[in-house]
Regions:
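Boundary at the C-terminal end of the N-terminal hydrophobic targeting segment
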Residues: 16-23
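Extended ligand-binding groove/face enriched in aromatic
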Residues: 46-229
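N-terminal carbohydrate-binding accessory modules
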Residues: 26
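Mature N-terminal segment immediately following signal peptide/propeptide cleavage
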Residues: 29-49
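Bacterial N-terminal signal peptides
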Residues: 4-16
């Protein structure tokens, strides 16, 4: 049994929206309390400084993104940290409770911390630092079957699996919500990244800045190819 990031909060948000629509008697307060309790647990106990991976053992002794993760790691690609941020903003809209907006701010600050100098995001980053992340790539990442990009540390950003885009969308929502200037600079940074990395034909590479240093099983490095997912 694993803790699935965001599922309890998402269910609560949906139920809360339904209660507002149908005015069910006596249940709204219970659901709101349960929803807040679950969110507080996810933010205070499950997250690492406001960042998430995908799955956790109930005792939090092990955790996974697309592969097993260190406790200090934060996963970007859905259903990782930006996905939780979107849920928190949805919960804020459903309830009007600033508790959820403040939790979303915490998630946004984590994403800003993990934004690469180029403006985008990798699949994952590590609060323990780049050397810790490189060590993970050299051990856990290299054991990945059919996960070629985890077998090599590029040090650049990815468009694959909505990595950079999911983080960018969430920061855009945070900025539009209250026009908080704290989100303007990182948002402009990722917009510049997106424009700079676009090919003249209109598509975008799997990863950027472009790298060609990881041919795999006799085939050329595909990370500069236009990506479709």
């Amino acid at each position: 049994v694993c803790i699935k990031v965001g599922l309890t909060l998402f269910a609560g948000a949906c139920l809360c929206g339904g209660i507002q629509a149908h005015s069910l008697n006596g249940e709204k307060e219970d659901i709101l309390n349960t929803m807040k309790s679950a969110t507080r647990y996810m933010m205070d106990s499950v997250s690492y400084r406001g960042g998430f991976v995908w799955n956790y053992l109930p005792d939090l002794s092990r955790s996974w993104g697309e592969m097993e993760a260190k406790r200090t790691m934060v996963w970007i690609q859905p259903p990782g940290t930006p996905s939780v941020g979107h849920l928190l903003l949805d919960a804020y809209h459903a309830t009007g409770d600033k508790f959820y907006y403040e939790a979303a701010e915490k998630v946004a600050n984590v994403l800003i911390w993990g934004q690469l100098e180029c403006g985008g995001w990798n699949y994952v980053f590590d609060f323990a630092g780049e050397n810790s992340l490189k060590e993970w790539y050299e051990t856990v990442g290299k054991s990945g079957w059919r996960l070629e990009e985890f077998r090599h540390y590029y040090g650049n950003a990815t468009y694959d699996d909505l990595g950079t885009i999911s983080a960018a969308k969430f920061l855009l929502r945070m900025y539009v919500e209250k026009n908080d200037p704290a989100y303007k600079a990182p948002l402009e940074k990722v917009i510049h990244f997106i424009l700079e990395s676009q090919y003249p034909v209109g598509g975008w590479p799997q990863r950027y800045p472009l790298r060609y240093d990881h041919p795999f099983e006799g085939k050329e490095d595909y990370s500069s190819f236009i990506t479709l997912n």
